[in-house]
Amino acid sequence: MDVLCEENTSLSSPTNSFMQLNDDTRLYHNDFNSGEANTSDAFNWTVDSENRTNLSCEGCLSPPCFSLLHLQEKNWSALLTAVVIILTIAGNILVIMAVSLEKKLQNATNYFLMSLAIADMLLGFLVMPVSMLTILYGYRWPLPSKLCAVWIYLDVLFSTASIMHLCAISLDRYVAIQNPIHHRRFNSRTKAFLKIIAVWTISVGISMPIPVFGLQDDSKVFKEGSCLLADDNFVLIGSFVSFFIPLTIMVITYFLTIKSLQKEATLCVSDLGTRAKLASFSFLPQSSLSSEKLFQRSIHREPGSYGRRTMQSISNEQKACKVLGIVFFLFVVMWCPFFITNIMAVICKESCNEDVIGALLNVFVWIGYLSSAVNPLVYTLFNKTYRSAFSRYIQCQYKENKKPLQLILVNTIPALAYKSSQLQTGQKENSKQDDKATENDCTMVALGKQHSEDAPADNSNTVNEKVSCV
């Protein structure tokens, strides 16, 4: 933008020139706020009465002029996108740290979640800031044209990697439920990393045609000065291969996993009832010895502990599926509008309004980006280990505080002493009760003898039986 001030004989002082320029600025603001401003003549005003000021802008629809004209409108959207970027980067860094440092979280599913967090973090570092820059420049590409294809490639790569990770997690958990022995045998850390490498390889292969053809032909990635996929074949094939097909696999395997868990829980409950019935059935007489009673009680306890362990494992699986289900649901809800609108833009090119479709795509793509920032919040709300780890990392405490040996002894020894004293008291009470029972038995024996002496001879057998029973 050029500001050309022509001095006149009546405008010799710098103060007057500044005041005149300020008047012209107020004139511009008044016209802009009244809604009469136009992008074609916003910077071509000339005050002809005194020939004081001439504001001109070459190419009024160029990015700098367009950005300056709509600066007041774009501030809020830029602020919101900046918040999304910060949340995405910070939250996913916390997830990566938690899986790397917490031993409780080091399993196959959390390794996939860590790789997913890496993809989301790179999306926040490399893709979202450039997208925010295009918003400030009126959705025009402000960088060198060769970087446009690279930026679209990274966008498609990280978005495809996200859906592929979720699809792989769903498949892995379904295999673990259906064939647990085989899954445990092939579920080492190395095998998990090999699966993650396979996911990234597939994502790179799907998105690689974009830079290959985009760098050769700018028309495939540019449309009216905006950096976007302009080839209809890229849009259709990419939408189905990178989103809809993995989405279908993910949803089907997730619901099959839920169904299998419900079936296992039902079988476990019925099996637990059968074991309890078999254990409660006793072949021993009621007047058995105390050791035999203890043996019977130990048999009765075994199925309960077995059932509790099995039900606990099923409950843990159900909780994990619940958290993953929320992640899947949010990802689908946030990305589906963009991909559906993307396909509509190709199918109904003639009947649909391109301006409306373009505006919807600009909004829906940021809703999809928001899913990368939401995942750490889901882990925080529904997983205690993640929540405690995040709170410690925010306070710069990277290791869990363990109690010193002295505190452990202070906390455990009094409890043990209390339990031992209670045990001794119980033993004393039991011994007193035994002594009383013995005294009663002895008195009964004495009474029996006395009664036998005074009683007739025909009752002697009955008395002797009573004494022997005691």
From Swiss-Prot:
Modified residues (Phosphoserine): 280
Motif position, PDZ-binding: 468-470
Keyword check for Zinc: no
Motif DRY motif: chain residues: 172-174
Region spans: Disordered: 448-470
Site entry (Hydrophobic barrier that decreases the speed of ligand binding and dissociation), positions: 229
Record topology, Extracellular segments: 1-80, 138-146, 216-232, 348-355
A GO term from the CC aspect: axon
Main location: membrane
Compartment(s): Cell membrane; Cell projection, Dendrite; Cell projection, Axon; Cytoplasmic vesicle
Regulation: G-protein coupled receptor activity is regulated by lipids: oleamide increases HTR2A-mediated activity.
Glycosylated residues (UniProt): 8, 38, 44, 51, 54, 75
SMART domains hit by this protein: 7TM_GPCR_Srsx (SM01381)
Residue ranges, compositional bias (Polar residues): 458-470
Family the UniProt entry places it in: Belongs to the G-protein coupled receptor 1 family.
Protein known as: 5-hydroxytryptamine receptor 2A
Underlying gene: HTR2A
